[in-house]
Amino acid sequence: MNELAGKHIVLGLSGGVACYKAADFCRQLIKAGATVQVVMTEAAERFITPVTMQALSGRTVYGSQWDAREPNNMPHINLSREADAIVIAPCSADFIARLVQGRADELLSLMCLARPIDRVPLLLAPAMNREMWAHPATQRNLAQVAQDGATVLGVGNGDQACGETGDGRMLEPSELLEEVIAFFAPKVLAGQKVLITAGPTFEAIDPVRGITNLSSGKMGFAIARAAREAGADVTLVAGPVHLPTPRGVRRLDVKSAQNMLEAVEGQAQGATLFIATAAVADWRVASQSTEKIKKDGSGQPPALNFVENPDILARVAQSPRAQSGALYCVGFAAESHDLLAHAAAKRLRKGVPLLVGNIGPATFGQDDNALLLVDEQGHRELPHASKRALAQQLVAEIARRLPR
C-alpha cells in the first residue's frame, strides 16, 4: 500500500550510532510512496555517508547551509517549504537542546527553525544512552520542544551500543514508519475509547488438548492499528495469537472465552466503541480433566460433555451503556455459506447496529479478505483487499455511523 503517496518527507539525521537505522527507514518511507529529501549534520556524516543516503533516497543530500547548488543559497528556506513533514531520525540529545534554544548555526537546525510551523510538522525520533534520556535536562527539553509544537515519537527499550540496557534506543524503522503513517491519518475517531477483541479462544479439554479454531487475529489487529491511527484510545483483548502489538495500542492477552468475557467486561465501562472480531468458541467441555486423557485400549472415545460458552457480543450489546447509546457495538460473523442471510440474522439476534460478515474458511490466516457490512439500512460490500486496507475502510465506515 502506498500509504504515503504524494507526501514529501525531509529526513534529518543528527549524530548518533542509530544513523544506521535511518538508511532502512528511508527505504521504507519510499516504499510507502513518499519522496524523501535527506539533510545531515556534520556529526551524522561521521556515522553514515551522504553517498549511502543519496543512493537510497535517489536525491542529492544536503549538509551545509553554504551549498552552491542552491541558486539563492537558501536551502533552509527551499527545503522546508517543499516538505509535508520534517522527521529527525535519529534525534540526539544535543539536537533536541538546539531546537529548544532556537539555535541556527547549521543547516538542519536552521531549517527546523525556518519551517512554516503551522504547515510543516516536525517529528522527532530520539536516540541516546539511557542515562542521557533520563537526565532532567533532556526531559525538560523534551517537554519544551513538545510545547513548541514538535511531535516526539518516543523511544524503545533494549540493548544499547554502549553495552547498557534501557530506554533511549531509537524506534525501529518499521515502528517509525507506522508512526509517520499514523500522523497523517484522518483523526475520525478522535476522543473515542475503542475496545477490540481479536483472535481465537482456546478451551482446554485436558492439560495438553483443547478446542480452538483457525482465526489468526490479523483482521482484529489491523483494525486496532487503524483505530489508533484514526485518533482513538485503543485496548485490544487478544486470544492466543503470535502477532506484534500495534504501536500505541494497549493489549490484554487471554486464553479462553471466559477469560475474554472477564477482560471485556472489565474494560467496557470506559469504552465508547466495542468491535468484537474474535472468533470465540461456542462450546467448552463441562469439566476439564486435570490429567491427560489416555487411551484405555477399548477403542472407545472418551465421553465429553459440553456446555455453551457465554455470548460476549450479545452480553455487551445488551448492557445498559450499549442500550443507552453510550457504547456503540460492532459484531463480526465468520460464515461458511449464505453470508448475507446469516449475517443479517446474527445482527438481529445479537442486537447490534452493525454486523460485519466474511467467509471464514477462505480468509483465516490470510493477509486479505472481503467484508460485508450489514445494518438496519441494508448491506454494503467492501471488496477483496488486504486486511490492512479493509481495516482502514471499516474504521471510516464505523466513524460515520457513530452517534454525534
Regions of interest found by a model, annotated:
Residues 1-124, 129-404:
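A cross-family phosphate/adenosyl-ligand binding-site feature
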